[in-house]
């Protein structure tokens, strides 16, 4: 299957959607795991309030076989290899998100922000999220402000941009700027430049949004060791353990890895 990467769109607007990056059957399998093993009420509307608003819509799952089957899919790696111009990459051990339709009393989505200091040229990375179900533009998915990305060379530090408690950099003054809400089909990958201000949007549809965060990039020794330790012990990487449910008492069984998966984890060296 041919996968199209709109690199010019990524360069101009700071994001791109890659259709069919992951087989739909792998997405369906992970959704099934969320429902049957993680007790996520995918089809039970009476319990959607349990995941109403951040951070309750983040699901503490990071080492399941169904996640690794997506991470180590060759097509997904090829996409990131094109972006980084090298095969020698590591993969993030991120989790899933289940965002039900918003109701009064639910928490608000995160504000538009950067996850990395946008003035630090050495911190530029590509970030990614896989849609596990069809996600309309009003369904709580990825949103961004391309005009701020396009004007990045004119940015300066000012009171309009602060850090929040999670050490994200907030884009406060965005009045009058277009906010783009990105729709996706199951299996699509949305990739964005870390210099693009973004967040999740409010789900004002009638169905949940389900997604899985997957990012690949060059991996230093500290990250490699943390990834391998997480896989071996079944515990999440240290920087997630302060989140609700992430320091679980019953750790994951180490997932079965392909040769590609072992290299992405950092267990084996790249040739």
Residue ranges and their predicted role:
Residues 2-12, 19-119:
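Non-heme Fe(II)-dependent double-stranded beta-helix
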Residues 119-137, 183, 215-218:
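Short, conserved beta-strand element in jelly-roll/cupin
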Residues 95, 114-116, 130-134, 146:
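Short, structured patches in soluble enzyme cores that scaffold and shape functional sites
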């Amino acid at each position: 299957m041919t996968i199209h990467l709109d690199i010019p769109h990524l360069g101009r607007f700071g994001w791109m959607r890659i259709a069919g990056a992951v087989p739909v059957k792998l997405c369906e399998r992970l959704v099934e795991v969320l429902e049957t093993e993680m007790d996520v009420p995918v089809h039970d509307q009476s319990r959607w309030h349990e995941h109403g608003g951040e951070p309750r819509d983040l699901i503490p799952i990071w080492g399941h076989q169904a996640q690794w089957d997506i991470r180590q899919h060759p097509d997904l790696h090829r996409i990131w290899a094109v972006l980084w111009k090298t095969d020698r990459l590591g993969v993030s051990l991120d989790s899933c998100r289940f965002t039900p339709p918003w109701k009064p009393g639910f928490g608000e989505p995160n504000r538009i922000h950067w996850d990395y200091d946008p003035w630090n040229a050495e911190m530029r990375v590509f970030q990614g999220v896989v849609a596990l179900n069809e996600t309309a533009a009003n369904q709580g998915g990825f949103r961004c402000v391309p005009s701020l990305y396009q004007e990045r060379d004119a940015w300066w530090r000012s009171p309009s941009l602060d850090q929040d408690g999670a050490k994200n950099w907030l884009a406060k003054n965005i009045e009058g700027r277009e906010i783009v809400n990105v729709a996706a089909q199951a299996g699509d990958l949305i990739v964005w430049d870390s210099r693009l201000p973004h967040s999740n949007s409010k789900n004002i549809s009638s169905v949940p949004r389900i997604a899985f965060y997957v990012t690949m990039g060059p991996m230093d020794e500290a990250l490699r060791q943390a990834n391998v330790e997480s896989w071996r012990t079944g515990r999440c990487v240290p920087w997630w353990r302060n989140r609700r449910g992430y320091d679980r008492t019953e750790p994951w069984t180490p997932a079965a890895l392909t040769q590609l998966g072992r290299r992405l984890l950092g267990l084996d060296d790249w040739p």
